[in-house]
Amino acid sequence: MNAHEWIDAFAAEIGAEPPTADEIKQVLDLAAVAAHSSERIAAPVACWVGGMTGASLEELQAAAERVGGSSETSDSA
């Protein structure tokens, strides 16, 4: 099972809609900021904490960049 199949199956298991390709990219961009400005463990935990808030992915990305001290966005992920 590849990553997209696993994500789709996990979403179905918990009764959620699977993320779109754009949403996956945004989550990975958020994880990258967290991991690159701290330690690797920050990536999944930041995504979980952000998800608990209900904030948009754009708001979470901006917050991560403020915390990480980055003013650039990732277009290469």
Predicted regions and their residues:
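C-terminal binding/interaction regions
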Residues: 4-10, 19, 58-77
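Amphipathic, hydrophobic secondary-structure cores in small proteins
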Residues: 17-55
